[in-house]
Amino acid sequence: MNRIKEFYRISRPAPKRELDDTACDRYYRRLRLQAFTAATLGYSLYYVCRTSLNVMKKPILDSGSLDASQLGVIGSALLFAYAVGKFVNGFIADYCNIKRFMATGLVVSASANALMGVLGLAQSVIPTAVVFVAFAVMWGLNGWAQSMGAPPAIISLSRWYPLKERGTYYGFFSASHNLGEFFSFLFVGSIVTFAGWQAGFFGSAAAGAIGGNVILCWLHP
């Protein structure tokens, strides 16, 4: 438990660098751009992991793996967990390392997608009821992990951009929802078309893994 607390502890201030005014300004602008890029691209890839099931619903129904009622329950599990998680994780994000917190959420979300793909591949030897329950649990876990995305991203933007610029950059950040849906339907949809819905979950998991690395490298607390 202590190791977990230490891992998510708020970072100590970085060592002071001896730079002239021009170099300092250039360095500051680079860090700001990296933080904005990580928040926006990272949250876009959060959306890929969140909306992947929407891309897979029709192929899953066509394959007879699950019916519409079961898919409705699975989707509701994500929404319920996401709603509760937004309330809880918004508070937690204020007291922890936002870079690691946001990256953890995306890695967990990607893992949930990957496990959905594994379950899909193994469905022929697993009872349908077990597949349904496992999907609901995994998608609920995904919903909770998804709630770990927005709070750290918004905190980062508020730290790096003053009030006179914050609205502009937050407006660009808000487009990450649409960007993520575009990535999901284009990238994941293409994978589903050529390799099946199970592979689609692996594709969204790969996108989440990429996003987690971007956040760890560029989202400066």
Protein language model features and the residues they cover:
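Hydrophobic core of transmembrane alpha-helices in multi-pass small-molecule transporters
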Residues: 112, 127-148
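Residue-level signature of mid-helix packing/kink "hotspots" within the transmembrane helices
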Residues: 51, 79-87, 181-182
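C-terminal ends and interior cores of transmembrane alpha-helices
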Residues: 107-128
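Extracytoplasmic
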Residues: 34-66
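Helix-loop-helix hairpin linking two adjacent transmembrane segments in secondary transporters
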Residues: 173, 177-220
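Cytoplasmic helix-loop-helix junction between adjacent transmembrane helices
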Residues: 138-178
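Helix-to-loop junctions at the C-terminal end of transmembrane segments
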Residues: 85-97
